[in-house]
């Protein structure tokens, strides 16, 4: 398989690389330390068309694909993951469900605003008692005439409480199967709907310039037409969304891993000890060689999964492999980058400190490492 980028994708990569270094890098540290959402940066990403990368032009998109999104995510995450996860969640979790499962009316209503970055969408799946048990949904939606009445709560929801958040698509139990198992459906809840409460932002270890909230629904009424896809198919729909999202998270994790290499190579050339740059020491060189090797192989993994996805081939196993490996690599490279920087790696003014804090969530969000191993084993034909 040829993993070299086409001229168009390489141009996109270079454009986002320049944006990340020229616009994001000088500003993001201050946003991060203030735990402040970077509206200025997000607006510029919208003007660049990044939120519309994988969507058709007829809905305001750029006419690209998921591979293009991955390229943008990797380049952003080489500099900062808060900005990258805002794009990832806005596209793969906020807008993609509407594109894949929405009615024509829903697409016309929401996608142009989502593709332009004027509005952010969010994905409400995880619940306080759920975690990896995504099927254990307790939020309910009861049909009352031409409306759904929603009650319940969601947690750890990215992009759900910004000033430009326009909607959250939530999963809710809408009935029971003959055997008693829940029928889970997906329903669009516009921001500001009465009874829909967004809590204050979480105080997080990392991703401090991104928006993450807990959501509560108390007799929230939305039109019956806000059902996304078929009733009872919400869980299956979001399993597909999560498969695709794992490829995007893998690209993001690869970017963080590569960013650790970038910063460490630069520091190793500048930092002198015992009369010479520390990069001349074999111990440092071997660390950097291993870090580059890991980042490179993580890139091969997500390129493979994304290539299969856009070609319409099965990619579930490859997505799980890419997500598992790249997130592990991100944590490993962040740890080694901090070690290479020594005491300075523990100081917040150095980007590697931010990368270290941001890396761990990649082994948890959008499917833990343990869940990825379960998925891989299942794809190998193994059952519990």
Give each language-model segment a name.
Residues 136, 192-223:
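Flexible, small-/acidic-enriched active-site or ligand-binding loops
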Residues 117-125, 170-171:
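A short, Trp-centered hydrophobic/proline-enriched beta-strand micro-motif
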Residues 151-197:
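A short core secondary-structure module
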Residues 49, 73-77, 172-173, 189-194, ...:
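Short Ser/Thr-interspersed hydrophobic loop/turn segments at strand-loop and sheet-helix junctions
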Residues 1-89, 101-106, 113-118, 131-134, ...:
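Alpha-helical interface subdomain recognition
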Residues 87, 114, 129-132, 158-163, ...:
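Short Gly/Pro-enriched turn/cap motifs at secondary-structure boundaries
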């Amino acid at each position: 398989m040829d993993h070299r980028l086409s001229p168009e994708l390489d141009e996109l990569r270079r454009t986002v690389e320049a944006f990340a270094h020229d616009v994001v890098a000088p500003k993001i540290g201050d946003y991060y330390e203030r735990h402040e959402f970077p509206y200025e940066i997000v607006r510029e990403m919208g003007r660049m068309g990044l939120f519309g990368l994988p969507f058709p032009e007829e809905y305001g998109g750029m006419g690209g694909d998921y591979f293009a999104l991955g390229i943008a995510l990797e380049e952003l995450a080489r500099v900062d993951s808060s900005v990258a996860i805002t794009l990832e969640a806005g596209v793969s979790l906020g807008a993609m469900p509407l594109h894949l499962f929405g009615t024509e009316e829903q697409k016309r209503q929401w996608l142009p605003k989502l593709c332009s970055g004027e509005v952010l969408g969010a994905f409400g799946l995880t619940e306080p008692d759920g975690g990896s048990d995504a099927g254990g949904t307790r939020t309910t939606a009861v049909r009352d005439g031409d409306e759904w009445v929603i009650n319940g709560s969601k947690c750890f929801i990215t992009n759900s409480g910004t000033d430009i958040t326009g909607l959250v698509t939530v999963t809710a139990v809408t009935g029971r199967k003959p055997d008693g198992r829940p029928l889970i459906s997906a329903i669009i809840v516009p921001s500001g709907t009465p009874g829909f409460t967004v809590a204050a932002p979480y105080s997080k270890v990392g991703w401090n310039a991104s928006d993450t909230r807990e959501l509560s629904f108390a007799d929230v009424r939305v039109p019956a037409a806000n059902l996304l896809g078929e009733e009872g198919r919400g869980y299956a729909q979001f399993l597909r969304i999560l498969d695709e999202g794992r490829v995007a998270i893998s690209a993001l994790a690869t970017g963080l891993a590569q960013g650790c290499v970038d910063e460490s190579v630069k520091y190793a050339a500048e930092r002198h000890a015992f009369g010479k740059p520390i990069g001349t020491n074999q111990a440092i060189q071997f660390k950097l060689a291993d870090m580059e090797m890991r980042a490179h192989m993580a890139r091969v993994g997500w390129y493979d999964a994304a290539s299969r996805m856009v070609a319409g081939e099965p990619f579930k196993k490859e997505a799980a492999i890419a997500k598992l490996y790249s997130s592990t690599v991100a944590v490993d490279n962040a740890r080694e980058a901090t070690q290479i920087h020594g005491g300075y790696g523990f100081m917040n003014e150095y980007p590697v400190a931010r990368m270290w804090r941001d890396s761990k969530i990649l082994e948890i969000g959008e499917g833990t490492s343990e869940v990825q191993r379960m998925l891989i084993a299942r794809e190998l034909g193994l059952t519990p």
